[in-house]
Amino acid sequence: LALLGLRRVEERVRGFLEFLASEYGQPCEQGLRLDLRLTHQDLAGALATTRVTVTRVLGQLREEGWLLLDDRRRLVITPLPRR
C-alpha cells in the first residue's frame, strides 16, 4: 500500500518490481530473475493504473537497461542504481 502513495506511476512500477525482486527474485547472471507469471493487467491492478501505462513504463525501464526479458520472457531486474 505504501507504493500507492508514490506520485509518479514510474516510481510505483519500479518500486513494486524491486519489492517482488527482493522477495521472490532468483539470482542470475544479469541480476534478479522474477519467475512469476504477471500480466501487464495484473501489474496495473496492483498499482492502481492502466495496462497501457504499465506497458509504456516497462518499455522505458527496458530502454534504460534496468529491466530485461530472458529467453523464457521472464523479467530480470538488473543491479543498476536508481535515478
Language-model features and meaning:
Residues L1-R14:
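A small-molecule sensor/coupling module
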Residues R14-S22:
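Amphipathic, well-packed alpha-helical segments that form the structural scaffold of globular domains
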Residues S22-R83:
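Phosphate-/nucleic-acid-contacting segments
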